[in-house]
Amino acid sequence: MAAAAVIEFQRAQEMLVSDRAASIDILQSIVKRDIQESDEEALRVKEQSILELGGLLAKTGQAAELGGLLKYVRPFLNSISKAKAARLVRSLLDLFLDMEAATGQEVELCLECIEWAKAEKRTFLRQALEARLVSLYFDTKRYQEALQLGSQLLRELKKMDDKALLVEVQLLESKTYHALSNLPKARAALTSARTTANAIYCPPKLQAALDMQSGIIHAAEEKDWKTAYSYFYEAFEGNDSIDSPKAITALKYMLLCKIMLNTPEDVQALVSGKLALRYAGRQTEALKCVAQASKNRSLANFEKALTDYKAELRDDPIISTHLAKLYDNLLEQNLIRVIEPFSRVQIDHISSLIKLPKPEVERKLSQMILDKKFHGILDQGEGVLIIFDEPPVDKTYEAALETIQNMSKVVDSLYNKAKKLT
């Protein structure tokens, strides 16, 4: 029995490249076969077949079949050791969730696996699955549920010795707080994660995720683009070394840093580099177009890039947030350049020069006046902008302070002399 299964398994592996469908059929027949619990070789082959079949179903995009496999193998898990069963469940669930197939069954399947782990009293497996559920809640923007389950899980993990899982949950907590714009708590959770990570060996995937989040926090909270760039570079190298699809995201954030540092000319050099060359495509092209628009101070090109590459730019919340700020700066620079020669100018004329709708130009000009970017008023009755000369700086306050300081020195000097005489 076991010998026949071994031969079939080997045949399935040989057919992986030439005929995947036939390979899947063979593996399914091995998985569905009933075996004796005492036959260790047959158990080993069935376990390998389940993992191989799961990998194949993930590669061929058969999400529903993979979800079905995860449910089907549960009775078999009682025949193998707890450690092997935990590895099998985690591997299959990770394969299913990493597909990002959006079947709508992800949370339900994850909850089913957690209930099974609870019923079987497998605490470590339950905690690992709950950490995956926190990640799933975060991905589906169910932030409150993610925080609630995450804080409950953190209390448990701090009493136990699974530091790698603790880092993972702390990192997810930081991401969730960042998504909710609670930057102080996001930074605190990240600091806790990095402190815990320093005490253990971090797998490349987890280390890359830590570096990525560190870069995001530095960019969001402190606008420290140089430090953020170095973190994104580490994250890119880490993800690239394990062929993770997140490498392209890290590369995009590196290019964003160069644009925000006002060195858009470095973007082309980065994209043409040896490491980044394999990631050439729409993702990098989008940032190249933004860099070119930023270099030329062209609002029209900037808006064209945002329209042409909507999925790559607007749908990424990190890039979208910072590009909105960049667009704002570009608009201000263009408006100041346009109004500079005038003391009184029609808003319609500014709108036609800058090729933007009049209400948007009006709104931005009024904001700039309030922020004291220039001195002027908007006469909406006549539809004109009146610009005043820069008022001379009143130095009375500075002169008064200087006089008081000098008087203080004189009084101190006289006091010291009088003290010596007495």
Swiss-Prot record:
Q: Show where the PCI domain sits.
A: 224-392
User: Which GO terms are recorded in the biological process aspect for this UniProt protein?
Assistant: proteasome assembly; stem cell differentiation; ubiquitin-dependent protein catabolic process
Q: What InterPro entries does this protein's entry cite?
A: 26S_Proteasome/COP9_Components (IPR050871), PCI_dom (IPR000717), Rpn6_C_helix (IPR040780), Rpn6_N (IPR040773), TPR-like_helical_dom_sf (IPR011990), WH_DNA-bd_sf (IPR036390)
Question: Per the record, GO CC terms?
Answer: cytosol; nucleus; proteasome accessory complex
What are the alphabetically sorted keywords of the record?
A: Cytoplasm, Nucleus, Proteasome
The entry sums up its family as follows: Belongs to the proteasome subunit S9 family.
* Subunit comment: Component of the 19S proteasome regulatory particle complex. The 26S proteasome consists of a 20S core particle (CP) and two 19S regulatory subunits (RP). The regulatory particle is made of a lid composed of 9 subunits including PSMD11, a base containing 6 ATPases and few additional components.
Q: What is the protein named?
A: 26S proteasome non-ATPase regulatory subunit 11
Can you name the source organism? Answer: Xenopus tropicalis
* Native organism taxonomy: Eukaryota, Metazoa, Chordata, Craniata, Vertebrata
